[in-house]
Amino acid sequence: MANKDVLLSVKDLTVEYTSEGEVIHAVNHVSFELEKGKTIGLVGETGAGKTSIARAILRILPEPPARVPGGEIEFEGKDLLKVSEADMQKIRGKEISMIFQDPMTALNPIMRVGEQIAEVVKLHEHCSRQESIEKAKKMLEMVGIPGERFYEYPHQFSGGMKQRVVIAMALACSPTLLLADEPTTALDVTIQAQVLDMINDLKRKLNTSMIMITHDLGIVAEVCDTVAVIYAGEIMEYGTREQIFHDPRYPYTIGLFGSLPDLNSDVERLSPIEGLPPNPADLPRGCAFHPRCPYAGEECRKEHIELKDIGGGHLCRCCRLNEIAAGKAKEV
Amino acid sequence: MKKFLSLVLALVMALSMASFASAEQGKSVVVGLAGDPGNIGPFQGMGLGRIGILFTTYEMLMVKDGDTFRGCLMKELTKVDDLTYDVELYDYIVDQAGNKLTASDIKFCFETAKADGNLPKLSSVDSVEVLSDYVARFHFTALAAGDLESLLMECPIVTQAAYEASADKMATDPITTSPYQVVDYKTGSTITYKRNENYWQKDELTVTTSRHNVDEITFKIIPDPVQMVNALKAKEIDISAAIDGSYISDFMGVEGFDVTQIPDNTTKYLIFNFDSIPNAAERQAIAYAVDVDDIIAFAFDGIGYHAKTVGNNKYPDFVESWNDEEYYEYDDDKAQALFAEAGVTAGKTYRLIYNVADDNTRIATTIQAALGDYGINVTLIPYDNALFGTYKYDDKKSGEWDIMLDEGGSSNLLTNVWKLTLDSRDQTYGKTVGHVADEKLQSLIEAAINDNSPENMDAFHQYLKEQCYEYGLVSKVNNLAHTTVVTRAATCFRGQILPGACEY
Amino acid sequence: MSVTAVGKDHVGVRSKRQGQFGQVMHRLRKNKVAMIGLSIMIVLIVIAILSPWITPYNYAKTSKADRYALPSWQHLFGCDGMGRDILSRIMYGARASLFLGLMSTIVATVVGVLLGSLVGYYGGKVDNIVMRILDIIQAIPGMLLSIAISAALGSGIGNTILALSIGGIPMTVRLLRGSILTVRKQEYIEAAEKINCSKWRVITSHILPNSIAPVIVSVTMGIGNTILQAASLSYIGLGVQPPTPEWGAMLSEGKSMITKYPHLCIFPGLAIMLVVLCLNMLGDGLRDAMDPKLKN
Amino acid sequence: MIRYIGKRLLWMIPVMLGIAILIFSIMYICPGDPASSLLGPSASAVELAAKREEMGLNDPYIVRLGRYLYQTFIKFDLGTSYKFGTSVFAGLMERMQYTLVIALLCMALQVFVGTPLGIAAATHHNGIADRICMFLALLGVSIPAFWLALMLVLIFAVNLGWLPTSGVSNGLASFILPCIANSFAGIASQARHTRSSMLEVIRSDYIVTAKAKGLSEKTVLFRHALPNALIPIITIVGNGMGMMLGGTVIIENVFAIPGVGRYMTDAINSRDYPVVMGGVLILGLIFSLIMLLVDIVYAFVDPRIKAQYEGRKGKK
């Protein structure tokens, strides 16, 4: 997996939360790599640990209760888990920035929106206040908000506009890595498309790499180069967009596609994945997915299963691939 | 921050140094006062705080000096007839502003005071007539025994010129004939007096209340009893009459301090409500059941006097022989017998109403415990001063209490103590405070008030005791604690400190 | 093109099953500090209930010999100026003090929260009128209000609670109003309104949980004061009459002896502190349990 | 905004009228007799009745109320104290100077000591600093003020002799102990409220956003968290200031400070009607003004609230 163009390489990342005496394993030994200018999609259900991965990269996990007991996050040759807080502050917002999930709460309610953008510009570009204001206005216009709304407060903006502000804020300093945490979930469909186009556009312009966190496979299809399917804090399947979309192997991934409305088939009902995600404080032994897996066998319950390359860099954490292939064949 | 702190500290030190420095010049005394005098004008009423500064601020026609009445501003008193008296003033009285005091000022003071209505005793002064510069003739509407003296002692005298020159009726800056002049009055905090170097009276004629042994007097108002103790300990005050009994041991026999004990002129007594306890045996039984020694121990730290009548034995019209009489001393057998006679059985409940104060609460609790021994319940109903004062005289409230713990005192005569609650003429509803409408009682008290001869006094006392309409409990002792700056403490007949008369 | 509900996280599911109240209780039960506070409170309440049978001495029994007795094995907390056992008086006094303290705090809080939510939620005219009425009430000294209540309505436990609680209401309303104003305009409230949530539901399950924290803090801290205040009411025909003990009255009785016989003050003072402490522990736990931001 | 303030100021007229009528009615139904405290304990019932008649206390309710309102709102005269014989307004202002000093010093202590303590506790949530701070806070709210006051006096005045035990005649030194004793509970409550409010805010998403921008801890804390956290605290401070300007009876009694609290309590106890009614009116006015100020400060700190004051045009 060695590649000279690698911008970010996450190895064995583990995140734990301590809550009321219980240890919750939010992220377990996650490893992946991201090349310059590329986009990786982290896909999974709410609570699967996607956001924790992004926040661990930026080191903005709430500590305590969160803790990163192990792993490496190599970004441009530095292990982000080891750099000093002061250095980290120089990276945040400048080299790596993040688009937050919930635009309603991501903005400081008592600060002018423009000010919140100008703040990050002034901080990292060491420019005058006036310049930072100019830049902030430009950023607002770039995301389609008139510059004169610089002086307004978040409550005067609609949800979609707030999300654009958040995006403008994240892109203000032309980061090399953008962490987009469900940037469109809170938006309605038309705006979703606009925002995605905008992100794609900006990405191309600035040659920014991106980690796209979503549970929406549609978005993945639109923007991602590689995809990691996260379940219970683990990468279950990893591959290029084509690999995942055309040849999903892990039962959970298959399930995700199964719960997609397929306009081409005339299936009356969606087939959602049965059951509930596991309690992260009490993960099942063996494969974390086995209680919900229609293909689960004895060995799935016994021991932890390793991520295996099943060809062409397509990784999958399953020991019953053959049975699944057979089952799939039968279905068809 | 550090700089600021050091600045503050320096300021504090400078300020405290300054205050020490000023205290060094001349002889001065600081008196701790528990009550706030409020308005120190001459014709205000006798609220509790005012009595403490009254004799330092004002002079009257007459004062009580020890056990005798002496003229202060008045040189001679001449009787014209039963209701007419001539008062002759010293002819060299000047006030602190240099105004001469004449008979017309006396007329002015009595008339103004009477019109203000704050000194209700003056209602028996019909008029004052100016006979000459220094002689005024008083016409009274009625005079009972002792009334003449109390009337002449009641009204503070100032010159009309000074009174009219004051912007606020002397409420804060009285100009008087007293040897001490108010130089600073921080309302609610301190009153400072300077000695008047031109005091009018010759030393050999000066009455006790007008002595002036110290150059400067400051009254410091300290409402909190513990802080009074602390202030004395820190020697911020030199003398106080308001040191709680339990702290006296901190000053008695302690280096640098001394304590003088003076019996208070008030007496605590029980008033029985005749409407709910009409049976004399029942009232007597309660009197027998209460052990005054317990009350003295619990409420007064062991220092107090048994009352021998409703009022204490310091008054001139107190009959000596009562001291040796039996007066409902605690007697379990008699109490039981009398309760049985009255048909009072265990489970009976009395409601005891009292004015809330630490000592009253303890007295009430002691009575409650004492009657509890007979299986009798006592419900305590404490009221704050204002409510008690109202309910005490309120006819409509009489259905709400059975026993009242009250206290009373007078500046001169025992009959005046009795008058407070036992003379139905003084109540708005024609009965005593205890709702007794007893013609014999009334005729006896009227006789005693008109002529307080030992026979009349004894007749009333014996009848009251026999009926036990009211039962005298105890007189407390005031503790005058002072630093050794004061070598001998002096008090007026109301038990208040006379800083000018103390010896230093 | 979006994924339909893939699954719910476990907390959300539990909330469906248990309702909001059960959920808060569940989280509260897991909070050790809060549970310690609650346990001590329960112990105190049990002591209060059982006190007529378990006090070492009769609370009203006076004794000349034991006046101001210092703490000893006979009298663990010593005796007061009437020679009464302080421990017994504190145990028995828990009845009046806890009852009055808790009840009037609850009344003040409930009324305050109701008013505060109305005012904060509706704003405008309602806000203006209610707040101005509170301005008027708050201008009247508490003592006068109590005397007026006593005079107009008579004595009795209900009026005592009224007198004690009336002073706490305006503060609660103001606090709640203040914090509701900040959440009032947030989208989730509007969203809840738009999906036709009843007003009651919007207030109780969306607005209050997000704005109640300052009220909890202030209420749990205020109970000590309420217990102290109860003492002054007994002079105006309300409250508890002597010799029935009550912590505030014990404290004010001991006040003048504080430097001479400090134990008269210390033990009732400690009792009050204990209650304040426990309620604060409980209050903190409750606030955390109600805080929706901690759900996940 | 100006319209809002103007409207609120106009509202003050009915509020003042309401206070006047309410306090008058309360004094009317409150038992207790100003005559008896004026004439002293040795006055008889007949003498008291005469005095009451003279003071006009026996007139019917409506007559007295009318007289009072006329005097207060038409002639702007609060009357003369029964007890002090001086004008109520002058008396109150004289007392106010002491109360104001104490209130300002205490508020300063409360804000400048309590707030940092609360912030420290919140930022070290569950750490040692938090525990110590919260313990002090609990101590602060549960220690009776008089107890603390007397202990301070015992140590610093009686034993060490550094400061006076009571009174106001030693300049600033007179106010040190009263202010410490009086502000302890305020500091404690300020610290707790700040902590609680900070904890809420620190968990907010926008704080994470701010952190993700690369702002330093300090900037995040002071520029983003604190202003948001202080919003509910404005009420606490405003209310506290209003209360303190009404006087702190316990502290004033212990330290023999002739402040507003003692003036009013004495007046209530002796039923000095003009002082009680005039005092309540003036203190009510001051309190209302402070509450208005609180609401204005709210609007300045929080644009959402300002929008609500200015009408509902808010969102675009």
Regions found by a protein language model. Give the residues of each.
Chain B
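Structural transition elements
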Residues: 8, 304-341, 359-360
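Periplasmic binding protein-like
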Residues: 31, 372-424, 455-456
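N-terminal lobe/hinge region of extracytoplasmic solute-binding protein
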Residues: 32-80, 88, 111, 175
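A structural "hinge/loop" feature
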Residues: 34-52, 73, 99, 147-156, ...
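Surface-exposed binding/hinge segments that line
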Residues: 78, 82, 120-163, 168-169, ...
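Periplasmic-binding protein-like
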Residues: 277-316, 362-363, 461-474
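Extracytoplasmic/peripheral linker and loop segments enriched in polar/acidic and small residues
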Residues: 379-388, 417-484
